[in-house]
Swiss-Prot record:
Disulfide bonds: none annotated. Its main location: cytoplasm. This is Protein-export protein SecB. It comes from Mesorhizobium japonicum (strain LMG 29417 / CECT 9101 / MAFF 303099) (Mesorhizobium loti (strain MAFF 303099)). Homotetramer, a dimer of dimers. One homotetramer interacts with 1 SecA dimer. One of the proteins required for the normal export of preproteins out of the cell cytoplasm. It is a molecular chaperone that binds to a subset of precursor proteins, maintaining them in a translocation-competent state. It also specifically binds to its receptor SecA. Keywords: Chaperone, Cytoplasm, Protein transport, Translocation, Transport. The keyword Oxidoreductase does not apply. It is found in: Cytoplasm. The keyword Transport applies. GO terms for biological process: protein folding; protein tetramerization; protein transport. Signal peptide: none annotated. Belongs to the SecB family.
C-alpha cells in the first residue's frame, strides 16, 4: 500500500508541472473602526408597533502591503430609523491581511474583492449583531452579501464612467 504522506511540498501537481500551488491565507483579522450611536436613547429604546427602516451600505477596499500580502477592508454601515428619528447608526471597518500567491494576475481583483470579503463577512456580521444588541436593540443580523454581484456592478460602473469624455 503506497502513501503520499512523504511527498515534498511543491512537488508535481498532477499535470507534470512543479511549483507552488495557488494559495490564499488569512494572516490576520482586526477591527479597524467600530462606532455605535444611539442619539435618541433612552427614548429610542421603547417598543414600536412596526419595524424600523434599516439602510445598509457595504464597501470593500484592498491595498497591497507587499508583493504577496494585501490588506482588505470591509466597511458596513447600518442606520435604523423610525419616522424621522434615528434609532441607531453603526459603522464597522473590519480588516483582514491576506497572503495570496500562485494565482494568475487576472484572478487577483476577483480574489481581493469577492473571496477576501466573503471570508471576513461572517465575523463582521457577528460584530454588528453584538454592537446593536449591546446598544439595547435586537441584534441586527445582516443578510448574506453577494460580493460577486457587487464586484461586477463596480466593474460595469467603472467602464461606464471611462466612456464619459471629459471636455
Amino acid at each position: 500500500m503506497a502513501s503520499n504522506d512523504d511527498a515534498p511540498v511543491g512537488a508535481a501537481n498532477g499535470n507534470g508541472n512543479t511549483g507552488a500551488q495557488p494559495s490564499l491565507n488569512v494572516l490576520a483579522q482586526y477591527v479597524k473602526d467600530l462606532s455605535f450611536e444611539s442619539p435618541g436613547a433612552p427614548n429610542s429604546l421603547r417598543g414600536r408597533d412596526k419595524a424600523p427602516g434599516i439602510a445598509i451600505n457595504v464597501n470593500v477596499n484592498a491595498n497591497p502591503l507587499s508583493d504577496k500580502q494585501f490588506d482588505v477592508n470591509l466597511t458596513l454601515n447600518a442606520k435604523a430609523s423610525f419616522d424621522q428619528e434615528v434609532l441607531f447608526n453603526v459603522e464597522l471597518v473590519y480588516g483582514g491581511v491576506f497572503a495570496i500567491s500562485g494565482f494568475p494576475q487576472e484572478h487577483m481583483l476577483p480574489i481581493l474583492f469577492i473571496e477576501c470579503p466573503r471570508l471576513l463577512f461572517p465575523f463582521a456580521r457577528q460584530i454588528i449583531a453584538e454592537a446593536t444588541r449591546n446598544g439595547g436593540f435586537p441584534p441586527l443580523m445582516l443578510d448574506p452579501i453577494d460580493f460577486a454581484q457587487m464586484f461586477q456592478q463596480k466593474i460595469a460602473e467603472d467602464q461606464a464612467a471611462s466612456k464619459v469624455k471629459v471636455s
